[in-house]
Amino acid sequence: MNHKFIALLLVVLCCALSVHQVSAEIPSHCTLPLATGTCRGYFPRFGYNVEMGKCVEFIYGGCDGNANNFRNLEECQQSCSV
């Protein structure tokens, strides 16, 4: 019984460390949510989608966004590449 608990604990620790390592490699501004903002503009932009692990296009309204907002795919990939 004690060996099973230790094995389970090791698995959990390994998973936690691997998640921490991946998130540490991605710049913090790239982990922000894709924010359309509160204005009604229509500006195609790119942002890093953490769940997909890549830059994706989204529509930015023109104000109140965040730093995960790039004018083109290349800028996003250069800033958020792992």
From Swiss-Prot:
Signal peptide span: 1-24
Location (main, coarse): secreted
Site feature: Reactive bond for trypsin: R40, G41
InterPro entries reported for this sequence: Kunitz_BPTI (IPR002223), Kunitz_BPTI_sf (IPR036880), Prtase_inh_Kunz-CS (IPR020901), TFPI/VKTCI-like (IPR050098)
Alphabetical GO biological process terms: negative regulation of fibrinolysis; venom-mediated suppression of fibrinolysis in another organism
The protein's role, per its UniProt record: Serine protease inhibitor that inhibits plasmin (Ki=2.01 nM) and trypsin. Acts as an antifibrinolytic agent.
Protein name: Kunitz-type serine protease inhibitor Bt-KTI
Lineage: Eukaryota, Metazoa, Ecdysozoa, Arthropoda, Hexapoda
